[in-house]
Amino acid sequence: MSINVFWFLPTHGDGHYLGSSEGARAVDYSYLQQIAQAADRLGFGGVLIPTGRSCEDSWLVAASLIPVTQRLKFLVALRPGIISPTLAARQAATLDRLSNGRALFNLVTGGDPEELAAEGLHLNHTERYEASAEFTHVWRKVLEGETVDFAGKHIQVKGAKLLFPPVQHPRPPLYFGGSSAAAQDLAAEQVELYLTWGEPPEQVKEKIEEVRAKAAAKGRTVRFGIRLHVIVRETTEEAWRAANRLIANLDDKTIADAQQAFAGFDSVGQQRMAALHGGKKDNLEISPNLWAGVGLVRGGAGTALVGDGPTVAQRIQEYADLGIDTFVFSGYPHLEEAYRVSELLFPHLDLATTELPTQRPATQPQGEVVANIYVPQKVSQS
């Protein structure tokens, strides 16, 4: 089975070491452009752009990189509760049209109550998933060309519709990750691809089986993806030295402070990541060639595949055998590691070819929209 491999744009910072300013690198537009263009040239199918208060805005970053890339797809965040589903649908359609079908969307409910409160969202975990399900329903239907009336517990819209359709039909794919039962229910019912963070294969297998069964009960099928860091070198010994170097400047206080902050999250996925290492720097190889060192101080994806090209490819195949067809990778620093992954890992993988959709013949009305709602009609010839 061919696999899709994405890279990552580090809009929240980059460098040679975790948790340290030593070896840090300024992340400005020029640098992000270098990474995006490298990923485009090297054969990555797309890039994940992170979201949150520690990041640059993912939509603006994606839009700014459209003109300087050719085939690269952009996986950007949808934030239920922070933006209306109708406005989000218009923005999604615009990004898809401007990029000629290179837009992908990642539903992010959020897992840090403190950050969400700062955004004006004061729902608990259960309520957030209720609101996310309502948001996603409206967003999907509007993008698919329907006129939507919806009265839910959290979202109410009347006459919501889209005048400018997306390039991808019926709409751009929706990605989503979450480890709670509520998250899996949402994935089974409404998304195209369920993402998991890089847990050991046995744990990932359990999650896939649960989501697959829930989707089947609703008459749906769902694709699967995984989010991992990668440390690949010419030899496995070199790769492990590189992994240890990455956390060489981490002290116990920095780790403890990070873990205390993560403990305030209500994200089940973040809790599962923290349990893999227990906040300690020893015994970080939690499964063959799967290293939990990144998660000592980084929220979200906290594990890395470590080894030479053939070894890492073997571990990737183990995940692929579970049904995963999309791998979202990253590595520090992200520019150099994009080249390393391409040169040392790609020759051992069966990579899917990136295909762009055919441009729709009429994505723009002929003439100006009348009264903000009516598309001008062609005058009949007598």
Curated annotation (Swiss-Prot):
GO terms for molecular function: alkanesulfonate monooxygenase activity. The keyword Flavoprotein applies. One of its GO terms (biological process) is alkanesulfonate catabolic process. Keywords: Flavoprotein, FMN, Monooxygenase, Oxidoreductase. It holds the Pfam family Bac_luciferase. Its EC number is 1.14.14.5. It catalyses: an alkanesulfonate + FMNH2 + O2 = an aldehyde + FMN + sulfite + H2O + 2 H(+). The keyword Flavoprotein applies. Catalyzes the desulfonation of aliphatic sulfonates. Belongs to the SsuD family. Homotetramer. FMNH(2) which is absolutely required for this enzymatic reaction, is provided by SsuE. This is Alkanesulfonate monooxygenase. It comes from Yersinia pestis.
